[in-house]
């Protein structure tokens, strides 16, 4: 498969928003621009967490465009416990003296091995001009997670998943405190041609916690729709 991995605004290597706008509407506009700019049509869309929500909203806005949609550990509703845990983690000091300090923090947060952490962390942090290390994401994105986007209430998000018209796969980590079993089951009932699956030995960061089973599940839907 040809894979295009997009960093959304304020994340990864994509620029920070000059106006601090990290609303769902702004991210939908970014997705429109990327997909149109690359000339994508009849393709498979996959997103995790924030990216998963952005993906199912985009899919609902563009019927008869996708070959498949994969949503990873998110839905129209998320659990307060997990939201608070992530928010508290993101509120920790964002300017550390060494790469290893970041690695130790991530190991404590995720329970992953040193090898797993070091393999992913190098893409997520950067060294600043003063020699310290910080996350690549814009600190302004922290405010996005504190309150729901008023233009996108839960009821509207449920309407979005019900409007998705392509085959879909919804994955949940069995230890996730963000995405509940009840929401997973409901999505499986209300979405058209939807398969749901729980990935064992995984929290919210499904693809990093159990990459083997995640890839197996992802390849399953890709194989089915790309024959």
Where are these regions (language model features)?
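Structural signature of beta-strand start/N-cap positions in the alpha/beta core
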Residues: 2, 39-44, 65-68, 167-169, ...
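Active-site loop/oxyanion-hole signature of alpha/beta-hydrolase fold enzymes
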Residues: 4-47, 216
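Alpha/beta-hydrolase active-site loop signature
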Residues: 8-12, 76, 203-206
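Conserved catalytic-core motifs of eukaryotic protein kinase domains, centered on the activation segment
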Residues: 14-20, 80-83, 181-182
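Conserved hydrolase catalytic core segment
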Residues: 38-80
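Helix-rich cap/lid subdomain of alpha/beta-hydrolase
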Residues: 74-137
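Conserved serine/cysteine hydrolase catalytic core
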Residues: 128-190, 195-198
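Catalytic active-site module of serine/aspartate enzymes centered on a nucleophile-bearing elbow/loop
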Residues: 192-227
């Amino acid at each position: 498969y040809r894979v295009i991995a997009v960093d959304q605004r304020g994340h990864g290597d994509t620029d920070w928003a000059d106006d601090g706008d990290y609303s769902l509407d702004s991210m939908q506009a970014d997705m429109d621009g990327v997909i149109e700019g690359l000339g994508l049509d009849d393709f498979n869309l996959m997103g995790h967490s924030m990216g998963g929500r952005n993906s199912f909203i985009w899919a609902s806005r563009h019927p008869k465009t996708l070959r498949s949609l994969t949503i990873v550990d998110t839905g129209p509703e998320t659990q307060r416990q997990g939201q608070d845990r992530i928010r508290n983690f993101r509120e920790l000091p964002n300017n550390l003296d060494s790469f290893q300090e970041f690695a130790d923090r991530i190991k404590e947060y995720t329970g992953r091995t040193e090898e797993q952490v070091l393999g992913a962390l190098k893409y997520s942090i950067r060294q600043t001009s003063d020699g310290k290390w910080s996350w690549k994401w814009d600190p302004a994105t922290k405010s996005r997670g504190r309150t729901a986007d008023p233009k996108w209430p839960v009821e509207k998000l449920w309407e979005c998943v019900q409007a998705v018209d392509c085959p879909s796969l919804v994955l949940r980590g069995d230890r996730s405190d963000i995405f509940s079993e009840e929401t997973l089951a409901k999505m499986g009932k209300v979405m058209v041609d939807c398969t749901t699956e729980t990935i064992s030995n995984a929290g919210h960061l499904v693809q990093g916690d159990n990459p083997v089973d995640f890839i197996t599940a992802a390849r399953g839907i890709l194989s089915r729709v790309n024959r």
